[in-house]
Amino acid sequence: MSLNNIIKNALVSLSDKTDLLKISKILAEKKINLFCTGGTADVLKKNKIPVLEISDYTNFPEIMNGRLKTLHPKIIGGILGRREKDQKIMKLHNLIPIDIVIVNFYPFEKIQNRKEFTIEEIIDNIDIGGPTLVRAAAKNYKDVIVIVDLSDFTSCIQLINTNTVSLETRFDLATKAFKYTALYEEIISKYFLKKNPYRKKHQKNIFPNEFQLNFIKKQDLRYGENQHQKSSFYIEKEILKSGTISSSNQIQGKNLSYNNICDADIALECVKEFSKPTCVIVKHGNPCGVSESNSLIKAYFSAYNADPISAFGGIIAFNCLLDLDTAQEIVKKQFVEVIIAPEIDEMAVKILKRKKNIRLLICGKIEKNKKGLDFKRITNGLLIQEYDCDEINAKNFDFVTNRLPTEKELEDAIFSWKVAKFVKSNAIVYSLNKTTIGIGAGQTSRIDATKLANLKVKDRNHNNTTGATMASDAFFPFRDGIDNAALIGISCIIQPGGSIRDKEVIESANEHNISMIFTKKRHFKH
């Protein structure tokens, strides 16, 4: 191999032809011969750019409606041929050395993300020749420059001008090429795993024997969970739906930190549970104030007042347009790290920009949680589970006490139950009028979580908690949780049930005239 070889021949095969003319003109100006497939060659000929059509060079036509174009020994051999070792065999078979390969693939990903497409369309957009050309060029990186990211083209041309395309550069381009082909194959394989039209429903396996993930960097973060930890934010390569922290757009404020993103994600996912204007305030991975109301400013005011001390420096999420009045109330009341909403009124943005450090995120239209997979990294391993996104249907509840909940109690109980799903276990949530009044989060015993929620209620001087509801993310192992809840006026409790002491727990509720609901489903969160 000699890095001093003059670049003479380039193969250009672009499905996305946005930059085709620009690239081809530059190559032609450098007296570099262009080898192209029929469609690409036609475009160049119309623009009077000299080109050699591959079928003319190979003396073999494109067949099968374009399915077979570039897979020919004269093409693959011209790319794979090592300049020092294979010269003799290349001359024997009249193989022209290809020095540059510039390729992008059929738009499989774009097709599969359309609302409507046929299986024939998706199959036709599986590129065969392109990945073969790219892999061959990357394998022979010492002699062939491979470009799959057109942003690399300008810098490569500058190096070609000075004949200084180093081995390091060639290897980097080859690395990017192999990543490109690997990701392309992964996207296709994922589609086939999920969308097999011939597989019966009962045969579907969401947990294959091997699991691969593909993410791209969205941004570097200020730091990780702690300031001495470096951190970056990666998002799924496949198209993102709106209404997530990953798809959100930051319009002002300092760079996000690792903790900002974690808390904003929890806040946003929690607020999606509610249909009316709702505010969720999160601190250190736990909701500290949640309220649903007929107006957003009332929801914010109530969520903030649920626990104003914890709300200091918190993350706020809304499920609807953030208006001017609410923005003014936020600025007046508290220090906030992040605000995220589907959209923000222009006047509200102006108000919030007075606080330059507030990170302001617009996430776009939100939808209630849908089914998907959740991942948790452990040492040398990965845990995968379905999202906890079960629909709540009161018809499936068991009402197990002598007294049934009133309509209002049932509404508040369901509200509390929705919030409890996002509170770290052991979790206890007290609510009144669709507003949390005390949250006991992350305790190692359920009674401690209950006592903490009681303490939150007392600290806020809630004078009238009669009629408040209590949600527990898991069953009560003993009656002590119910006895403690009764001390502050809890009148309805919602919990999964399933304890060996359920009878004792129900008896306690009856003694205190508390209605109790069994959901028969648990909401642990670790």
Swiss-Prot record:
Catalytic activity: (6R)-10-formyltetrahydrofolate + 5-amino-1-(5-phospho-beta-D-ribosyl)imidazole-4-carboxamide = 5-formamido-1-(5-phospho-D-ribosyl)imidazole-4-carboxamide + (6S)-5,6,7,8-tetrahydrofolate; IMP + H2O = 5-formamido-1-(5-phospho-D-ribosyl)imidazole-4-carboxamide
Keyword Protein transport annotated: no
SUPFAM superfamilies linked to this entry: Cytidine deaminase-like (SSF53927), Methylglyoxal synthase-like (SSF52335)
The protein's Enzyme Commission number: 2.1.2.3, 3.5.4.10
InterPro entries: AICAR_Tfase_dup_dom_sf (IPR024051), Cytidine_deaminase-like (IPR016193), MGS-like_dom (IPR011607), MGS-like_dom_sf (IPR036914), PurH-like (IPR002695)
Sequence similarity: Belongs to the PurH family.
Domain note: The IMP cyclohydrolase activity resides in the N-terminal region.
Residues covered by the MGS-like domain: 1-148
Protein name as annotated: Bifunctional purine biosynthesis protein PurH
Example GO biological process: 'de novo' IMP biosynthetic process
Cellular component terms per the entry's GO annotation: cytosol
Keyword list, A-Z: Hydrolase, Multifunctional enzyme, Purine biosynthesis, Transferase
Record HAMAP family: PurH
One Pfam family this sequence matches: AICARFT_IMPCHas
MF terms in GO: IMP cyclohydrolase activity; phosphoribosylaminoimidazolecarboxamide formyltransferase activity
Pathway membership, UniProt: Purine metabolism; IMP biosynthesis via de novo pathway; 5-formamido-1-(5-phospho-D-ribosyl)imidazole-4-carboxamide from 5-amino-1-(5-phospho-D-ribosyl)imidazole-4-carboxamide (10-formyl THF route): step 1/1; Purine metabolism; IMP biosynthesis via de novo pathway; IMP from 5-formamido-1-(5-phospho-D-ribosyl)imidazole-4-carboxamide: step 1/1
